[in-house]
Amino acid sequence: MPLFDGKTLTGWEQHSGTAEYRVQDGAVVGKTVAGTGNSFLCTAKKYSDFILELDFKVDPSMNSGIQFRSNYYTQETEVEIAGKKKKFPADRVHGYQFEIDPSPRAYTGGVYDEGRRGWLFDLKNNEVARKAFKQGEWNNARIECRGSSIKTFLNGVAAADLTDELTKEGVIALQVHGIGKKTEAVGKEVMWKNIRIQELK
């Protein structure tokens, strides 16, 4: 089932930051702006068990990601995560992220816990997946969530494979990473298209 109609952002809503999102040539385009933290274009609906696939293209100087089973609170909320108390500002998106990392580190396809625990599965021991990323081209992302099992694939190559119990449901979201004080990074773009999901019973 398509999550994006290729023409409008119907069914999506922006949270956390003020990066610019628009539709162009059948793709969602996210553009960096100054003075904001990470921004997320989120589905209005939450998903639990699913197979998500999409194509993405990213400026080589950027960092981005695809959130899944992610959430946010309407007001400041304190919760306990891994035995530690953590305070979330209102509207701060947090949760699992399929990393998009065009840097030489090449962790695209790894799973990062945005706003919570950090890296859950990096790619330092998966050289095949690190080499699967195509710089400056469209890449295919696939995310499979079944219960506590999370698997990711980059251009058909197995990337991350982990078991995690923390969150079983949440939104899908497209991240434009904040750029801090890097004025030279203003106006950089990341694109996503052919966004589709198969919900699993």
Give the ranges of each region predicted by the language model.
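Carbohydrate-interacting regions of secretory-pathway proteins
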Residues: M1-K201
